[in-house]
């Protein structure tokens, strides 16, 4: 089997990657999103940071997998649009951003391996190594032997399952990332799906030392509902935790005296506001019904101490900002933060 060359140069791929991803968390989230797009019921993320300068990241999804033809025709194409080209398969539910998942892998590592299989194709293993590559050269995916990966738990599960994809990334630099960074990664991953609505499941195993338990933990949606002052919802069942909730916030008087106030969270139905939106629109030549569904919440405070007092699930740091207006389409994240476009 011959190698498969990218159509863009190494320098162009690096440039696109740096523009798309601001940190390790955003790049890893993109790889996980690709697993959700592959219809995987489970996505397993392993991060081994025992040597932070040379960390190991592995994403295994139980999705449909890729054949050698899929790799050649789709995977290496930057900007391949699944929504337009595979409508029957994705049904408008694509989450990854138009064929740029491989840029996320390149952002994280100069060397990564793809092990993949579909129900109707044989298992193949590919490696991309750009270390030492000239800026004007085009990277090439090379077919490699599977022997060194046969002992991976994910490989054994893939063989047993008969379909799926494993991406192994070597020498990922995670120096300077501490507990807050990885806590923030879990928040970012949980934002990929709507609260309590996605049947697919994301699992994570963070290996920090030789004594770390060898088990995956589920990524659970965590929203600091009890720190919300106002909530606008199409269905109040989405925000049950806000019912009969009282929050506290600090303020200064005109004389500079620190005070605290408490108040009840106010919940307003979309039906009573201009937020109630529905109708019909043509999508890719097909007329479909659309309706704005969900909720918008306004935090009572972004002061860390007060917010944590209201709800210990509140997280805000250099790696994660909860003040986002996220848009979901059919239960999956379509726009991470609409506020940036307003």
Outline where the language-model segments fall.
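N-terminal phosphate-binding caps/lids of nucleotide- and nucleic-acid-binding domains
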Residues: 109, 159, 166, 186-197, ...
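GHKL (Bergerat-fold) ATPase N-terminal catalytic module, capturing the glycine-rich phosphate-binding loop
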Residues: 1-166
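ATP-binding catalytic core of ATPases
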Residues: 136-213
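GHKL/Bergerat-fold ATPase module in large chromosome/replication-associated machines
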Residues: 206-342
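Short helix/loop capping segments that flank catalytic or ligand/cofactor-binding pockets
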Residues: 67-69, 176-178, 335-338
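Residues at beta-strand starts and edge strands
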Residues: 41-43, 53, 110, 163-165, ...
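Flexible glycine-/small-residue-rich
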Residues: 116, 169-171, 329-331
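Generic recognition of flexible, low-complexity loop/linker segments
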Residues: 32, 102, 154-156, 190, ...
């Amino acid at each position: 089997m011959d190698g498969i060359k990218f159509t863009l140069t190494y320098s162009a791929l690096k440039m696109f990657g740096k523009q798309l991803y601001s940190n390790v968390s955003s790049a890893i989230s993109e790889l996980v999103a690709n697993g959700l797009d592959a219809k995987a019921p489970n996505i397993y993320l392993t991060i081994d940071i025992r040597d932070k300068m040379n960390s190991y990241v592995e994403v295994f999804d139980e999705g449909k997998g890729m054949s050698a033809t899929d790799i050649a025709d789709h995977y290496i194409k930057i900007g391949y649009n699944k929504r337009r080209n595979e409508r029957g398969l994705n049904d408008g539910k694509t989450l990854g951003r138009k064929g740029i998942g491989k840029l996320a892998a390149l952002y994280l590592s100069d060397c990564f391996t793809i092990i993949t299989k579909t129900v109707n194709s044989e298992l193949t293993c590919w490696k991309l190594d750009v270390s030492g590559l000239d800026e004007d050269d085009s990277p090439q995916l090379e077919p490699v032997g599977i022997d060194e990966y046969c002992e991976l738990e994910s490989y054994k599960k893939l063989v047993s399952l008969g379909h799926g994809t494993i991406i192994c990334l070597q020498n990922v630099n995670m120096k300077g990332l501490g507990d807050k960074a990885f806590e923030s990664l879990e928040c970012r991953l949980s934002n990929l799906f709507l609260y309590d609505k996605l049947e697919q499941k994301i699992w994570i195993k963070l290996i920090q030392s030789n004594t770390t338990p060898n088990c995956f933990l589920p990524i659970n949606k965590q929203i600091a509902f009890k720190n919300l002052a106002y909530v606008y919802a199409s269905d109040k069942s989405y925000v049950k935790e806000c019912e009969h909730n009282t929050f506290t916030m600090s303020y200064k008087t005109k004389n500079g005296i620190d005070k605290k106030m408490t108040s009840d969270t106010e919940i307003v139905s979309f039906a009573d506001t201009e937020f109630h939106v529905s109708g019909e629109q043509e999508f890719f030549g097909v007329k479909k019904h659309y309706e704005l569904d969900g909720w918008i919440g306004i935090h009572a405070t972004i002061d860390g101490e007060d917010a944590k007092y209201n709800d210990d699930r509140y997280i805000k740091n250099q790696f994660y900002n909860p003040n986002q207006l996220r848009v979901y389409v059919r239960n999956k994240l379509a726009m991470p933060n609409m506020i940036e476009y307003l």
